[in-house]
Swiss-Prot record:
InterPro entries: Wax_synthase, Wax_synthase_dom. One of its GO terms (cellular component) is membrane. It is an enzyme of class 2 (transferase). Its EC number is 2.3.1.-. Belongs to the wax synthase family. Glycans are attached at N8. This is Acetyltransferase sirH. The chain crosses the membrane at residues 33-53, 55-75, 78-98, 305-325, 329-349, 366-386.
């Protein structure tokens, strides 16, 4: 019996390996519809009442989707953001339905939010209740940072959006989108392309570039990534607020204060976008509780830290599964635990610094900015190398550079049709 099970498992694994190695280019319809399909599964499986049935249906749907995608298709750079959102939707669904019950765990904290508790609804129709549950589910799955919900990120910045009228909000965000594109083009044309090798139609091994060039290119790409993410976020805000599906106060700035960039911990915890923070925090809490770690202990603090970055690594590795890179695919995962290790070293240095009587001040923070710049441009070289290896900087389906550096021309490079829509799900 045991031999049969092992033989059957081995043959199945070999069949999957063969299918994985003989995958075809992802069809156009799939590149445009996969992320909405994943989101639709998440929204629709929230509609049935709590119980094992919807968990089984959801697990079956997500498992089937992933098995089909991973064994049949490969994609290109334009699918980068879709891969991240597909795995993020899956992980968030598992946390909601397997590790909890969304109807109990989540509720809105504003009067404008939809509630699924009906007061005096003896005569309420099933259709009305179903539509209310659908609206609530859409609002829940459209909110990843918790604005207006009981899981709001306490580090969210608050700005002019709190007092702006709808018209002022739309105009200011449209202007910022145009400004971001202008700045990004300037950075690409006069800085990034100046450091990029002038090799037409040639593969560039990012790790072979001079050290200073690599650090400079990574820093510039970080700037361009932040501008791209900010623009997509603002486009989503214009859509939702313009259609009266949301209000300006639910769209605080995507990024935190640049003055906090004196530690790597602050980079990831306060400055960079916090779209997936709740996923990482929830996973860390589950592991910490499983270890019976008490709040305030080192075990509690660092189990949550490392689990959060490991989950982020898995999230980023989804890109390498769908967009193969023999040289840099592994880096999409290991970059995240590397940041956790740097944060640990930071904590040790801060502890012994305090013991030695070193006080926080301008000079210490100046050193912190240098520290953060060094480690970020060193480790972020892994995903930049990945993008380079899959043709992201040479015009082959480029998803971030609007123009290839081989010519610095004005030719527009096609991107995934749902790159913008991906970012709409999760920025409220």
């Amino acid at each position: 019996m045991a031999d049969y099970v092992i033989q059957n498992l081995t043959s199945n694994l070999q069949a999957m390996q063969y299918a994985y190695s003989s995958r075809e280019e992802m069809p156009v319809w799939a590149t445009k519809l996969l992320t909405p399909i994943f989101m639709a599964v998440a929204v629709l499986t929230t509609l049935p009442p709590p119980g094992p049935l919807r968990v089984i249906v959801g697990l079956t749907a997500f498992t089937s989707l992933w098995l089909h995608v991973l064994t049949h298709w490969v994609s290109g750079p334009a699918f980068f953001m879709d891969a991240i959102f597909m795995i993020s939707i899956t992980v968030r669904w598992l946390l909601m339905f397997v590790a909890g019950t969304p109807e109990i765990d989540y509720h809105q904290t504003t009067q404008s939010g939809t509630t699924i508790t009906h007061k005096g609804t003896k005569d309420s129709s099933t259709l009305r209740q179903g539509l209310t549950k659908l609206r609530w589910s859409v609002e829940l799955w459209s909110c990843w940072r918790g604005q207006g919900w009981n899981f709001v990120d306490q580090h969210l910045p608050r700005g002019a959006e709190r007092t702006q009228s709808r018209w002022e909000f739309l105009v200011s965000n449209a202007g910022r989108v145009l400004l971001n594109q202008y700045i990004s083009d300037l950075v690409r044309k006069y800085a990034f392309c100046a450091l990029w090798p002038a090799q037409v139609d040639a593969h560039v091994d990012f790790s072979s570039l001079p050290l200073l060039n690599r650090h400079g290119l990574v820093a510039l790409q970080l700037i361009r990534d932040s501008l791209m993410l900010d623009s997509e976020y603002r486009k989503a805000s214009i859509l939702f607020v313009g259609l009266h599906l949301s209000t300006p106060d639910r769209w605080p700035s995507l990024f935190g204060n640049m003055r906090d960039l004196y530690t790597v911990r602050n980079f990831w915890g306060r400055v960079w976008h916090q779209i997936f923070r709740q996923i990482f925090t929830r996973c860390g809490d589950i592991v910490a509780n499983a270890l019976n770690a008490q709040k305030g202990t080192l075990l509690y603090k660092y189990s949550r830290l490392y689990v959060g970055f490991l989950v982020s690594g898995v999230q980023h590795y989804a890109c390498a599964l769908l967009i193969p890179s023999a040289e840099y695919g592994w880096g999409m995962f290991w970059q995240m635990p590397a940041y956790a290790a740097v944060v640990t070293v930071e904590d040790i240095l801060k502890y012994y610094g305090r013991e030695a009587g070193i006080q926080d001040g301008n000079f210490v923070r100046f050193l912190g900015y240098i520290w953060t710049a060094y480690w970020m441009t060193l480790i972020y070289a892994l995903p930049v190398g990945f993008v380079s290896d899959i043709g992201g900087f040479t015009g082959d389906g480029n998803f971030q550079l609007s123009d290839p550096c081989v010519s610095c021309s004005s030719t527009s490079i096609p991107v995934s049709g749902f790159e913008s829509i991906d970012l709409e799900f999760g920025l409220w």
